[in-house]
Structures are given as C-alpha cells and as structure tokens.
C-alpha cells in the first residue's frame, strides 16, 4: 500500500508537468522546471522516508523536549487540563444516573422524582458544560504557549550567526523555511494540543467506565468493547500510514504555490511592464496573416477569345488558377487558425501559466488527500456509529444468551447502556485522534527536518571562516590542512584559510582562492592591499565574481585558500545593489541594523542628512502619513512607495550616519544620477570612509585610486588609476596572467 502511495505521488509530479503531446510523457527536466522542483528525486526520497513509524516518533520526542525546555508553565497547564478532565468525567457519571431516574419517574408517574431529577440534571449538565469550556480554554493556551516556545527556539537558531543565509544559499534540504516557521508550527501546536486533550480525557473515561461496566454488567462487557475498538485502531493504522507521505507533499505544494504568488506581489510592476511589449507582438502576429499574397477572384486571368483553341487554353488556365486559388485560401485559413491558437495560448502570462501548473499539481495531490481522508473517515465513523449496536448487544447477553436468563429493569437498562456508551466514547476519542495524527505527522517531519538541518549547518565547519583578532604577540594562526565542502558534487580540499582582524587601517587579501556555492572555481591567488583612504573599484563582466569577492571579504561565503586581514565588523558596512528596507519609520531605516531601543536620531540631524541628498521631502511625506493615520509605524512598507533611486539614497544615508571605516558598495549608486553619485563619494571622503565599489560605470573611475578588473577567462588585473583634473583617466596596468604568471603593462582606457 505504501509503495503504491509513493508511485501515486510520483505520478502527481509527472502529470503536473506533462505537455499536450500524444505520448503524454515528460522528462525529469520538465518536471523540475515547471514545478520549480530543483531536487525532485531528493524530495521523493524524503517523502518515502516520512512515514508513520518509530523514527517519526523519535523525531516527535525531540520536539516535545524543546516544548518542555522550560517546564513550569507547560506542566501547570497539563495539570489543570488533567484536573478539569477528571472533574468532567466524574460529573458525567451523574448524567447516567439522572437519565435512569427520569426514565423511572416517567414509567412510575412520580412527579417529585421527575422534578428533582431535572433540577439535579441542570447542575450536572451545567457543570459538565463549564468544565468542557475550561478544557477548550486550557487547550488554546497550551497551543499558544507551545507555539511561542517552538517558534522562538527555531528563530533563535535560524538567525544565529546568519545561519538563515547559509541555509538559503548553500543548502537545499529545506523548502520554504518561512512556511515551516510560520504556518507549520501554528498548525502543529494547535493539532498537538487538541490531541493531548483527547489523550488525557480518553484514558480517564476508559478506566473509569471500564470499572463501572464490570461492576454493573460483568467481565465480558469491557472485553467486547476493548476488542471492538482495537480492531478499529489497526484498520485505521493501515489507512493512516500512507497519508503521512501525502500530507507531507501537500504541505510542500502549498508552500510552493504561496511562494510563487509572493514573488508576483514583490515583482508586480516588472511583470506588468514586460507584458506590455508582449501585447504589441500579439497584435503584429494578427496583421501579418492579412498581408499574405494569395489569389482571389479579382486576380483571375480574364481574356475573351473567339478562337476555339484559344478558348480551350483559356479554360485550362482558369482551372489551374482556381485550383491555386483554392489552395491559397485553405493555406490562409490554416494560418489564421494557427495564429488564433497561438494568440490564445499567448494570452496567458508566464506567471499565470506557472501558477496554473503549480495549482494543478496542488489540486491533484489534494484530491488524493480527500480520497484517503474519505477512507479514514469512513472507517472511523463506522466504528463510532456501530458502537450503540455493540452496546445493546452487550446488554442483551444476560437476557438472551446466558443460562441464567433474566429480564432487566428499565432503570438497569439505562444505567448499563450509558456506561457502555461512555466506555465506547472513550475509545472513539482515540479513533478520532488517528485522523489528526495523520496531519500531525506531516508537520512533525517538516519541523524536525528544519531543526535537524539548522543544527547540522551550524556544526558544518566547512562553511565557517575562523576569525581571530590579531595582537602583537599573535600575528598568525593556522587552520587544519584539510577542510571539505559538504553537500557538493565535488570535494575541495583546502590548505589554509583564515580571516584576521586589525584596527581598521586596511583590508588585505593574501593568495585568496574562492569558489561559487556549487563548487565552481572563480579566481585564485588574489593578493591585494586596500589601505585606508585609497578607494578600490572592482569591474568586470556580469557574473564574473565581483559581488562574490565582496561576500568573501564580509565572511558570508567561505573561501578555501589564502587569508584575509580586515577590520572588525563594526568598522565595515555593506551596501547591496537592491537596498534592504525594513517595515518601520525612516528613522528606523537609517538606524538599521540597530533599533530604536538601542539608538535614536534627533529630528534636526535626520533633516540635515536627507537634505544633503535632496530627499528631505520624504520626511514631510512620512509626517503626513502619521498625521492622517493611514498606516502604523510597525507595518509601514517603504519598499513599495519609493523608487529604486530613492531606496539607494536611503541606504547611502544609512551608511553616512553609521560612518564606518570601510564601506563595501555593490553597485549601490546604479539607480541615482551622476551628480548625486559624485556627492556620495565626496561626503564619504569627508567622513574618512574608504570605499570598495563594484560597478560598471566609467564615471566611477575618478572616485577611486585602484582598479581590480576581472575578465571572462578568470584572470584578474590590478591597476593604478591616475586622475588628471578629473577629466581623463590614465591607468597604469599590471597584468597578472594566472596561467603563465606573466606580468605586462598596457593601457585599458584611452
């Protein structure tokens, strides 16, 4: 059964990416591209591993240990839940007695007994309802507390030492970590608290009413109920086990579908602009068909001849022309149909087509979930609804099937029936729990995988760079001679890699060799010294590894040979091409990565900073927004309200405010005018900020004293820039060929 289930899941992946071809088959590459499954085989392997077994239970225990890491509040809630369950179970006993008294008073006509039973019943049922509400309240608080504990635990690990970046950049074992931290944890804790509630009250009901059934009926009563529901449990177990894998896949598909729409929201303007040109091309495709050269009736060769032979020749030519005319019309009709079909297909945006394919895969698997859930619900409900018949069968045994046959009093029938029904209801809770466990198992797998991968990445020394602060006694420090990149197709042995910290006077790279996260070597043996006050410009083709070198210097990416000596993190500041703006006020944008709790900026300084770069109108706009109460500070999203140039200027003001000794700017002025760009470098020079820039503009040369140039052949060139009246740039080039170690001088720019 499990094997067929995995095959069905594989069919879901394949069918969702199948084309309209007659064979109906698709390659693995099509599956990966259309569903964005970069690791389809790996995912199927994970699905096969996620089954309801002992390994899953051990994963669950590890999560429970986290939930009870601070045990006082969880244990207190557990005891309150247990006490409320005991009270509700005890009160329910009187409900059966009251029903017996009411039934007896009606058959005997005892009005006083009837009224007193009703009054007592109000108290009993009211108390039972009150404790039921208390139990639900405790369950909600328990879920809230567990979510708080688990989410904060995972977030603490996820954000520690930029672990989130390592996972997203270097590891593909976790899909949609945002979904796992947000919705998966919420759903898991809600389900778990509900299951715990049923597992606490269920045993109490079973134990208590087992005793009552034994004392009021005989030993066979609880034995029959036990056997009946153990049979139901094993049948449900067979149906439930395959659902773990299906639910795991469903959670992944839901996350991928949500992520796709999140990307559409983030890039809505770009998508709309790209598709404007697409509409024009569609219009051209319709007009091109109308320009086809073909014959019609007006182009027939008409000429009147009296001669019979000439008339016959005319008739033959007319037939040929008509035949060509007919073929042309058929051809034009076919082209029109094909064009209309293409236009119809092109009406869908690429994003819409992707969303459609993702949604079809989601719906296909959801249909399987529904069918399997139907089977589980059927078996569960069957055992629940048949329990009254089992109850009456048990009561009938002493009446019809034992040697000492004796009729039962009506009051006895009521009490015995109620006790059997309550015992059956206790077991029914376990049957109902099995439905929740199938959903819970998927969340256990996803959350535990998140925790396991975070811990493994934290312990993976191949992604770490040892950073030490040098002093006069200790100028160097060696690392092990063999370090291997994990999770790569190829292993890369490293001889020496090290980042040492100085007092902020220079950044030095000594024989640094670095690779992409996929293991492709970019450049080797880069040696360069950037002293304070000497700006460095890095130029080269797109994708040549310019930004990668910035990541290496920052310590985000590992490098595998050489050493780096640089200032401490507090003396360095990084500006990406796409600025990062948080939800908050403009003051919070400038303070980032600090918060208002740590620092504040006076309004006069804020105004001066923004005026310096001609965007002080943003402060007035923010004041208007606050005054009109359109949005609160916490959720204010400036990213959607500012142009790319304004966003880059905000990031530059952030840099100017923090005044680091070194700034690493990755095309951070690409969206602002050259006049403002000149002002940026001028202000940075006034404040003593040494800049390492990545860029393509020739205008950047005059703000730097050294050029590090990359080419497409993985060679690097270190060049001195000589500015003459800021009009021209003469560059004395030192050409270092990594293959021949040949040193030559030439000129790059005229």
UniProtKB/Swiss-Prot annotation:
InterPro entries given in the database record: AAA+_ATPase (IPR003593), ABC1_TM_dom (IPR011527), ABC1_TM_sf (IPR036640), ABC_transporter-like_ATP-bd (IPR003439), ABC_transporter-like_CS (IPR017871), ABC_transporter_sub-D (IPR050835), P-loop_NTPase (IPR027417)
Pfam families assigned: ABC_membrane_2, ABC_tran
GO BP, one annotated term: very long-chain fatty acid catabolic process
Name of encoding gene: abcD3
Gene Ontology terms, MF aspect: ABC-type transporter activity; ATP binding; ATP hydrolysis activity; ATPase-coupled transmembrane transporter activity; long-chain fatty acid transmembrane transporter activity
PANTHER family assigned to the protein according to its UniProt record, in alphabetical order: ATP-BINDING CASSETTE, SUB-FAMILY D MEMBER (PTHR11384), LYSOSOMAL COBALAMIN TRANSPORTER ABCD4 (PTHR11384:SF59)
Protein name per Swiss-Prot or TrEMBL: ABC transporter D family member 3
Coiled-coil parts of chain: 334-370
Record lineage: Eukaryota, Amoebozoa, Evosea, Eumycetozoa, Dictyostelia
